[in-house]
Amino acid sequence: MNSKRDRFEKQLLIKNVFESKQLFLTILRFTVPTFFFALFSAAYVFIDQIMVIKFVPRSELNPDSIFTDQSLIDEFKNSAFYKSDSFLSSGLNIKQFIKTVLNISQPLIVLLNAINIFIPLGTGVIFSKAIGRNDQNKIQEAWNTGLISTTVFGLITQFLVLSFAKEWLHYNLDQSSFEQNFQANSFQQFFNKKAIDVASEYVYILIGLNIIPMLSRLFFYLAQSEGRQLFIAIVPPIANLINILIVFLLVRYSSLGVIGSAVAGILGYLINFLAYIIYLIYLNKRNLTYLTFKTIKLNKIDFNLLVVVSLIGMASFFRNGSLSIVTTFYESFLVNLTKATTDKNDVFYLTLLTGPIAISNLASAAIFGLLQGVRTVSSYKFGQKKYDEIKKINIYTVIICISFGSLIYLLTAVAFGKQILSSFFDVSDQNLDLANYFSLIVQAQVFFVATGANSQQYFQNTNRVLYSWIVSLTHGLFVFIPLLFIFQAITLQTNNIEVFIWLLTANAALAGLINIAFGQIHTNLFMDKYFANPPQNKLVKFIEKYS
């Protein structure tokens, strides 16, 4: 009797959060907390990069730093690369070195983000649907299967990514071409090899303990499905503020340099993880959650459900994973085109784009936070079979994303663009106008990335997983690959490297418009037909049965 009453109270508590006379207000109730969650998470990464750039090299901010231009030169002279001093006038310095380390590490960081949401996101979608239709068995299956499979998957992928991480970093700087032209610039060769070595240490720390942020992500999705918006809006942002303090202490007052950032990141992830655990223990004691530890059983994994979870999460994995590939190819081609079309050092434009790309990533992450809030509401409504409300959600989401994106772009690119670049990324006065021009171009992605991804979450939530994969890969591969070679050819033909800078935004715009059209057409013309007469496709029937 008590268990029935407890289940009723849990369901009533959750229903009160999801139900509202105004659907738009319900969406805002979920999107605003996830927006701030994503904003603070991205802001941590953003500020982390700024503090590394500001505090690691010796300057007025850190006069005791051991990382100086001279220390870089001295290390070069003591290396096997040193032949003469003739290459020391290449313009490379310690600040460019640090920016290069951060830049070539970013694709692997994006890949880790893709891995982190693969199982957790699909689990969250299934969990929300099960709560929407009050399916107690499916709720417990999703919780049990999601927790165990996330843990196992996290441990396996850590070792897998570690096995190829250094080779990936090599490719980012096109190391093979440097080796073929060793005599051309021995200091450049030394510079890039050292950057790869330091970046390897940096990513090894993050990869080796990636299970911690992965489990935190699972708890985030499941807590959101239960309507824990207040916790999500307050505790993770506080944890990120603590992260920032730890980064400052390690990069400013230790000799770890860039590595201090990775150590601080892991400590911050651990704090966030412990906050979720403590909160869940509290909810368990008061019997206010479906996420009960006593119901976890290692021998009761529903493998059919795990397949469905993986199929749903695959779209987000494809999106983030393909974006990692996009960044890798973009950086590698940019370095090669800089050599081919300019007299600048190989990483001049790569380091100049550090600020614009970091700001763009911050803005896009915040907008993706909105989508996560929408995904939870949409999954819940799908569980209730309220298809008309899902249509409205799809339209509201595009409007919300464009509105927030416009506000962020006006603030970070137009109003305060130069101030951010000069104050936080140490862009010199002579390069400031060019960097700001690049920033205006690169940040324009924000209008298209999330609005296009809205179609992905719509297809994920309504069991059309193949369509969600297509949407994800359209942005990451289908559009990018042909554009990559088109922009490379135009850049070489015109001998103008600035043409290539437009590639990321052109890719986001074209893919975003295609995906928006695809999602809206399906929602308004085919959705009712699909649910009135579900197709007999074996994959769709399998997902419908086990989700």
Curated annotation (Swiss-Prot):
GO molecular function annotations of the record: antiporter activity; xenobiotic transmembrane transporter activity
Localization annotation: Cell membrane
Chief subcellular location: membrane
UniProtKB keywords: Cell membrane, Membrane, Transmembrane, Transmembrane helix
UniProt organism field: Mycoplasma genitalium (strain ATCC 33530 / DSM 19775 / NCTC 10195 / G37) (Mycoplasmoides genitalium)
Pfam family, one: MatE
CDD domains found in the cross-reference section: MATE_like
Transmembrane segments: 33-53, 107-127, 145-165, 203-223, 231-251, 263-283, 298-318, 351-371, 397-417, 432-452, 470-490, 499-519
GO cellular component, as recorded: plasma membrane
Origin superkingdom: Bacteria
Topology relative to the membrane: Multi-pass membrane protein
Identification of the protein by name: Uncharacterized protein MG447
